[in-house]
């Protein structure tokens, strides 16, 4: 929505990717299936999952309760799928991420085969490394295994420290570059910049609550969902980043913004979001939307 509303030729302000690191347990959850199905349908090419595929849960191996072909499952959702055979192969993971970023029409799943408890001589690839601390003696063995002083804690090697400091400097420079671009954008598109700054600050336009409908008490009264729908439509034109919908219940919960189109793979400026019958994903997606400055998400369903 931000990109569709504010990006202009030569000013690609909003083009970031969203990453999720997913465990075997995350992949099993029903909400994961709902969200992944919808993301594939909407062709959200900016979404990248890194799947920590270690085959271990708290109770033991995933084969106790799970034997799905996750890669094929996500392909059926319309995702771009890659596999990295070794979770310690940084170059292979980097290449997979770069490939995923080139994919514009499909979200990406990168299945990375990892070893839980890697470096622990007695607990690697076991459930013991999942839900409990390694313990002092095992931790000492891990340090020795990696060539660290076993008597020291919170060890950060010099080359690691240098690497992160370089990344920090690179990030600072990218931030400066973005703000330089934004200052130029502000000169060329002052109205759009002013609107974005207001909404991203958490403030609302001064006139947002002008001419709101008034509901008088009566014998019959009005269902709260009907009143809510009228209120949403009354403020929608004044709040351009108000976006939401329902889990296939818009006619009943009155969440449709009648003056605006639906959000779709072809129209990211649409403001009516069709979640399908995916209530769990709807809740998670709305929370994710709320993390983006400026966007005001809403949703509705029946509670029984």
What are these regions (language model features)?
Residues 1-18, 83, 166-304:
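Thiamine diphosphate
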């Amino acid at each position: 929505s931000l990109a569709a509303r504010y990006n202009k030729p030569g000013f690609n302000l909003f083009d970031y990717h969203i990453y999720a690191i997913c465990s075997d347990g995350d992949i099993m959850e029903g909400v994961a299936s709902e969200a992944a199905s919808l993301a594939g349908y909407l062709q959200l090419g900016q979404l990248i999952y890194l799947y920590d595929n270690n085959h271990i849960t708290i109770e033991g191996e995933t084969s106790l309760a799970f034997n799905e072909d996750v890669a094929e499952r996500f392909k059926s959702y319309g995702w771009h799928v890659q596999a990295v055979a070794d979770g310690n192969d940084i170059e292979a993971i980097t290449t997979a991420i770069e490939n995923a970023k080139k994919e514009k029409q499909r979200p990406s799943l990168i299945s990375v085969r990892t070893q839980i408890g890697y470096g622990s001589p007695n607990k690697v690839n076991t459930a013991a490394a999942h839900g409990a601390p390694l313990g002092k003696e095992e931790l000492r063995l891990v340090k020795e295994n990696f060539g660290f002083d076993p008597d020291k804690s919170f060890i950060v090697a010099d080359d690691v420290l240098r690497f992160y400091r370089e990344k920090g400097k690179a990030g600072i420079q990218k931030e400066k570059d973005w703000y330089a671009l934004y200052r130029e954008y502000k000169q060329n598109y002052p109205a759009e910049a002013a609107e974005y700054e207001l909404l991203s600050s958490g403030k609302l336009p001064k006139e947002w609550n002008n001419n709101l409908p008034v509901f008088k008490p009566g014998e019959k009264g009005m269902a709260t969902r009907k009143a809510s729908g009228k209120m949403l439509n009354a403020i929608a034109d004044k709040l351009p980043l108000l976006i939401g919908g329902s889990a296939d219940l818009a006619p009943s919960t009155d969440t449709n913004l009648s003056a605006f189109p639906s959000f779709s793979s072809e129209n990211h400026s649409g403001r009516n979001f069709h979640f399908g019958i995916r209530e769990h994903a709807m809740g998670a997606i709305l929370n994710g939307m709320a993390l983006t400055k400026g966007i005001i998400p809403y949703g509705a369903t029946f509670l029984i």
